[in-house]
Amino acid sequence: MDLAGAQLTQRELARLAVSNISHATVVPALVKDHHQWQCQRCCSRRPVALPDGRIYCSECVALGRLTSADHLYRFEQAHLPVGDGQLTWHGVLTPDQQTASDALQASVAAGREHLIWAVTGAGKTEMLFPTIAQLIQQQKRVAIVSPRIDVIRELAPRFRTAFATTPISVRYGGHFDQTDSDLLLATVHQLLRFYRAFDLIVVDEVDA
């Protein structure tokens, strides 16, 4: 089971039947800083008081309620040598697509944010492939996320074809792969179940 970089609650660990947590760092789910409560999962500073005196975070409650009596279990990021990052996509980028792809690689290498803005069908997904392949070959982890479940469900088979020798985890509401992987496809809110786990995060349909 892939726990590298995971940030989970005790309830989630029980549901996943994780018994060995000796290598996890345990932190309070909510902390009080300068007289203000902050959620350690989503970083929200909008606490709500419960009748029994506990404080809970209302911002990420959809992932399960966290209170001031709860803890988060953070597992150290570790390289998972499970895929070779070989690109098994046999298409060819157009000159304009190649220019955009090269610019993305340069930005990632320099640690800069990068925006690819193009119409539907312009090949934005394919432009990502060389950068992702390079990072996985460098033993780094990549997350492809979107606010929309349908986007992740549509992307999953395309990435599994393009990276046939690299195990891929897919996670969204109602679907939770437990595969060890260097490449994650997930809805955006699933990232709250990770802590400093990825070397590159790509947000698709960022305006959705």
PLM feature spans:
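Interdomain "pre-motor" coupling segment immediately N-terminal to P-loop NTPase/helicase cores
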Residues: T25-H79
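Conserved RecA-like ASCE P-loop NTPase motor core of nucleic-acid helicases/translocases
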Residues: K140-R148
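Walker A/P-loop
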Residues: A109-A133
